[in-house]
């Protein structure tokens, strides 16, 4: 099915965003693992996998529309130096993705509808808003309420968990 170039271009922009988010989550998850923060490592590694699933969905949609996935204009991730900055950078990126997703959905639901692309983006938007963003906001809220040291202690998990 031949898709509109404007839709394919927007889907490619989203694809780049999902892959950069996956890269950022990948680095952050390994930093958490290195620091012994097992619970954060597991959650952020799960988020990385979600981003790769979103990228897969977008690639499949682009190919279905007879487009070519284009990740040539891929910026680098924004890697934090400590737990709060890492969570904040991840949240900032997710909020930017939400804005982009809403723009693409509005474009696809316009006068010349591309509803399958809109549906794909709506699925990603729902997961991003209700899972990723909410969780990151909760973590930053916990740090503000309980203090960084208490948060880090709770994020470490059991001592035996990190042993391999």
UniProtKB/Swiss-Prot annotation:
Fe cation 1 binds at residues 18, 51, 54, 129. One of its GO terms (molecular function) is ferric iron binding. Residues 1-147 form the Ferritin-like diiron domain. Fe cation 2 binds at residues 51, 94, 129, 132. Pfam families: Ferritin (PF00210). PANTHER family: BACTERIOFERRITIN. Belongs to the bacterioferritin family. This is Bacterial ferritin. It comes from Paramagnetospirillum magnetotacticum (Aquaspirillum magnetotacticum).
């Amino acid at each position: 099915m031949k898709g509109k170039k404007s839709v394919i271009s927007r889907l490619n922009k989203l694809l780049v965003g999902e892959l950069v988010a996956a890269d950022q989550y990948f680095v952050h998850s390994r930093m958490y693992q290195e620091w012994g923060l097992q619970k954060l490592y597991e959650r952020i590694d799960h988020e990385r996998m979600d981003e790769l699933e979103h990228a897969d969905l977008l690639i499949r949609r682009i190919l279905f529309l007879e487009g070519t996935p284009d990740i040539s204009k891929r910026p680098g991730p924004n890697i934090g130096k400590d737990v709060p900055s890492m969570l904040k950078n991840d949240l900032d990126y997710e909020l930017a993705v939400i804005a982009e997703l809403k723009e693409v959905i509005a474009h696809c639901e316009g006068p010349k509808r591309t509803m399958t692309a809109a549906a794909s983006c709506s699925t990603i938007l729902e997961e991003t808003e209700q899972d990723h963003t909410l969780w990151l906001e909760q973590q930053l809220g916990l740090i503000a309420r309980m203090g960084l040291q208490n948060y880090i202690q709770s994020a470490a998990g059991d001592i035996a968990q990190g042993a391999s």
